[in-house]
Amino acid sequence: MKELFQKIWQNELQFLNFDAKFQDKSKLDTAECAIILSVNKDNYERYFLLKEFQELCKKIDLRVDIFSMQNAQICILNLFKSGFISKQDLLKALKILEKISKNTEIFDFILQEKVQSIDQKALFQNDFKELNTINLELQKLSFDENLKSRLQKTLEKFQNLEFNIAITGVMNAGKSSLLNALLKEDFLGVSNIPETANLTVLSYGKSEEAKIYFWDKKEWQNILESSHFNADLKEFIDKLDKSVNIEDFIKDKPLIQNIALCELKNFSSAKNKISALIKKIEIKSHLEFLKNNISIVDTPGLDDVVVQREIVTNEYLRESDFLIHLMNASQSLTQKDADFLVHCLLNSRLSKFLIVLTKADLLSKKDLEEVIVYTKESLKSRLVDLDENLVEKIDFLCVSAKMASDFYKGLASKESLQKSGMQEFENYLFNELYAGEKSKIALRAYKKELHLELKNILSEYEMQNRLIKENKQGVSEENQKLLLELQKQNTLLKEAQDEISNSIAKLKNIDSGIDNLVLLLAKKLKERLIDEFKYLKNNAQKLNLSRILNIVDITTKDGINDILREIKFENIKKIEELKTNLSLKYDFLKDDFDNGFEGFKDGISKNIDSIFQSEKFALLRLKIEKLSNLKSDLYELETNLDTVIFDTFKEFKMSEILNSLNINGAFFEFLNDKLKHYEKNQKSKLESLEKVLQSLKNQDANILNSFEENLEKIEKLKQLEMGLLNAD
């Protein structure tokens, strides 16, 4: 490693400890690690001036100077060599940075370095086990039942952390076969649980059962409205109306039916007409794979005629922790695949996802590699006007579900399983989930909550010993002083409550003129479409409907994302400023305010993202598609587009929905919960203090003799605190 640093830093190389390691291994993601590694003697001055780079350094308490930068690079490389950073992901990130930073030496070093393989699932579970052990020890040391109960609830909350995997693909991509191989049992697509056209959520349950959720009247009305612009959907619904009494299933409030798994074939089979009335299906099973707190979302095929099912799918994709897209290796990249993948690359919050080439046993290794290259190049060509590097978010694996299933059924040897690619797929999946951002956030949040409770317990025992010690020395004034301190904090607490109420009342909901911005976006979309139609007419070119819809997608979604990003920034900025001011004024509340604040902000961001109505947008696409196919002159087309686009954009009602989120009210509830938590602790401390003072006054032998016991507990708590701070 020293030779590498001599190459990239030359005469700027500092005196360094090449065994240096980060105290917290999870503070930086792979992209941030790559940015720090790309700093060298030729570019460090430019990097140091960038505001974004300064913010990155601040995140890990790193000074912006040469020594600190080189030391951080050593820490990152040691993390990488220990197996905590994915080699493949780090190389991808460095490759993207090549355009702004020449990083050949560091790239080659990582490429050639042999790294340890880490079982991320085992590591994650071990980290949780350590924190659970600390939690149980704190429960033993707790001084009241309320605190013990809070710690137990915290343990259960994090113990039940769930991961959601979404599986997508066109019909016949092999979803059921792959899932059966993953579950190691023929569970889906068999007689009892047929292949379904509905979105199906599969999760762990002690008993096996299913829940059927039907569309409500409002949702069904949207489907009917969509059918006016889609001939296939109209024909489908007309046939359905003649064969099924729709009113039996479509109610004002969604009808939910609990059924046994064996009854599922009567509802969900793609051949069964009733399946069209079903919004989603939830299946509970005690399959071994699902015991890992993993839920699998099996989505309808991308070529589904019911647009609303696609909207429900997109809502689940937004909440998923990982996305797996299946493609039949023999059929390669279809138009539907390409459209979906480009949409995900442009809009998904996920940092990466996986394409699995199914039925891999039907092609040679060389042919499979060619399919991967072709898929990457095809996607890059679709992204040429945007960002080709987005393709680097995709990983590829080749799997034969049949070979794996044959082994699990006892029809093939272990060699068949090893050649199937199924074990690599399963290991990849566990590593991505358990080393992902959700896992890191959960561990950090758990540590923070435990540390807060530990400090409360520690302060209680220290306070008791201070009272006992001062009593022995005959300093009763000090005891009264301590009592007054607690009473004063109670007064300040009331003051803080009043100030929070007044501050929240003065806060304005920030919508950044959202309705005007949406109308400007509508104007931009109409102009882009008219420019495209004029170009086609002037050059006597045939209409490419896919390109028209691509313009609609990219213009609308990019514009909406920009608007929402600004709204999120402004709203989060105002609540951060208020929280900071309150923490400075009432410093005894700082830890409580910090606890859970990142999760609160994340929730606000997700709520703001959800205000864009996907159903209205889907209807807009159908209307534009129909207008595009009509043989009308440019003037008539422009008039019709103007009406359709502006009317639909007004229907988005984004300002109204944003106000209904009541962000200020939610922030008030967050702060109020923290005040209640602190108030409970203070009340408990005050009661304990008064009890101790009374016992001391009565010369109670038990309290007088508890000094040494408390010292042991204090020592134990300090050891637990060290364990908590060192826990990874």
From Swiss-Prot:
GDP binds at M171, N172, A173, G174, K175, S176, S177, K359, S400, A401, K402. Disulfide bonds: none annotated. Residues 1-119 are annotated as: Assembly domain, required for tetramerization. One of its GO terms (cellular component) is cytosol. Its main location: cytoplasm. It is found in: Cytoplasm, Cytosol. Residues 159-442 form the Dynamin-type G domain. GO terms for molecular function: GTP binding; hydrolase activity. Residues 298-301 are annotated as: G3 motif. Disruption phenotype: Double dlp1-dlp2 deletions have no obvious cell division defects, have no flagella (possibly due to loss of expression of flgP) and are non-motile. Residues 358-361 are annotated as: G4 motif. Residues 169-176 are annotated as: G1 motif. Residues 470-695 are annotated as: Required for liposome binding but not for tetramerization. Residues 195-196 are annotated as: G2 motif. Gene3D superfamilies: P-loop containing nucleotide triphosphate hydrolases. Coiled coil: none annotated. The keyword Metal-binding does not apply. It catalyses: GTP + H2O = GDP + phosphate + H(+). It comes from the Bacteria. Keywords: Cytoplasm, GTP-binding, Hydrolase, Nucleotide-binding. Forms a 2:2 heterotetramer with DLP1. DLP2 forms a central back-to-back dimer flanked on each side by a DLP1 subunit. In the crystal structures the 2 DLP1 subunits are in very different conformations. Belongs to the TRAFAC class dynamin-like GTPase superfamily. Dynamin/Fzo/YdjA family. The heterotetrameric DLP1(2)-DLP2(2) complex tethers liposomes and may mediate their fusion. Initial binding is probably mediated by DLP1, while DLP2 couples DLP1 subunits and increases the effective reach of the complex up to 45 nm. The role of the nucleotide is unknown. This subunit alone weakly binds to liposomes; GTP, GDP, GMPPCP and GMPPNP do not change heterotetramer binding. Tetramerization is required for GTPase activity, suggesting the GTPase domains (dynamin-type G) from DLP1 and DLP2 must dimerize to reconstitute the GTPase active site. Protein is very flexible, is probably able to bind membranes in many conformations. The N-terminus of DLP2 inserts into the assembly domain of DLP1; this is followed by a 9 residue DLP2 linker which allows DLP1 significant movement. The linker is long enough to allow the GTPase domains (dynamin-type G) of DLP1 and DLP2 to heterodimerize. This is Dynamin-like protein 1. It comes from Campylobacter jejuni subsp. jejuni serotype O:23/36 (strain 81-176). The gene is dlp1.
